[in-house]
């Protein structure tokens, strides 16, 4: 069975289910582009979602239902995305063939490309059409998602009266919303830092060429601060984001920041090095940060210093319209980084 990772039609409500919070985004498509109708989030109890696995589907479902109710969202068609160990995204190089032949090849030969039993996964693919007159081979993006994990999400959403018509991958969702805002000519590393995972998607020539999920996230930093000073999680979170003054704790917090964020930077550098080794003539233009972890105080400057590249926070709503009486533009900008994946799902058309 295939899932519609690469499909196009009517818009859905984007639902980003992370380990820390659920984010929701609803857009409207017009002749002038997209308009933001609704955005919102709700924090989940710790452990309700872990590395993409729904440990407490009833609790997560209740949180989503309450969020839809509070935002007065009437649409029942939604999309969600997955990441972590349950999904494999791999680029394979194959001989050029007709679409039906390519599908047949992928479905019969997939086990040589993915580490899962073929019976246990949903598969989808996209021909990137990289062949030329001189080269009769093409790159194909292959996605395999564990049925057990995906089915848990589908069942949870169905139980609260929602119909999932889009199943996306975090990296693709990020790519969707980024490409709406920025010309495709750039070579960019999209880095989304969530509470428990970091997604890296390097785009070159309008195509994903490096995609990685790494099990590190901003919760690490919060927990280190919490344990160091024996304080509540919320206070540690404020110190991490710089919304609470560090005062006499400044030096210790900087040391924690250096320890944890150096690990993040090493993972980002690995992906960049891989990109450069395969694309020596196409230097990376910049790094674009998203996710709640992207707002960690000092991270943008630290990453600039360590990589020598321009680094910026991503605002997926920069080129979208909104009802200023309902949603303040400054608010949209402030929550933009953590709403990137939800908006990337919402920008995706449905197939049903």
Predicted regions: what is each one?
Residues 19, 25-36, 80, 135-235:
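Small-residue (GG/TT-enriched) beta-loop-alpha framework at ligand/catalytic clefts
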Residues 64-77, 160, 231, 269-286:
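Phosphate/pyrophosphate-binding loops at sites that engage ATP/ADP/AMP, CoA/4′-phosphopantetheine
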Residues 227, 238-286, 293:
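Adenine-nucleotide phosphate-binding core of ATP-dependent small-molecule kinases
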